[in-house]
Amino acid sequence: YKREQDSAAPRIRLTNGLAAPDMVQGPDGRFYLYYFMGGTKMISVAVCDEPAGKYEFYGYVKYSDGIAIGKKNEPFQFDPGIFMDDDGKLYLYTGFALAGNPILLDGSKPTEHGPMCFELDPSDMLTVLNGPSYIGVAGEKESIGTPYEGHSFLEASSMRKFNGTYYFIYSTMNSHELCYATSDSPVKGFQYGGILVSNGDVGLEGVPDVKHARCNTGNTHGSIIELNGKYFVFYHRH
């Protein structure tokens, strides 16, 4: 899939590539790739009959009036995480919390309340049924005095469900770590759970912070999967 297949793709390529895509299989058996196109403020979708095949542009996530999310002065739409629940409901999670980043924000405002959630119509995989709403994962300002302090939301939304519990995985303001929060609902009440992994060695004995790191640290995205009863974390290395 090439950026030029998206009609909204800016001509200038610098910082205007496809960022942090996520994919889900729809009720029709096809595979839907959700991504952020730099310079558009929207979440785009491509579709294919197989997960690793040739994707074609499909459309933009939009409200019922046809206006794309990101075009109604909402906080910045970024790093989409798409999740199909086992009851057939479809949820999109987005957000970016770093203030003062003119290259990425492009005039948009960062989220101050953590990630946003949209319930989408699974019949077309695009139309918003409910939202945006905030799920309880704290941004930097509102994290003060809470378990999220020091590990507030930055970006890289990802939702998983294991044994009836929802796990929201995200990259924190520290950038080098993935943390998680849990809830019994996909749309609210998430409580901080802890650090999944740092892509350096922060947190090991004698390494209290990045300044003392012996390994390279840098921005990380990722999530967790369960295979044959074992759980695995995948993330960025530098």
Predicted regions and their residues:
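Carbohydrate-active catalytic/glycan-binding domains of CAZyme proteins
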Residues: 1-238
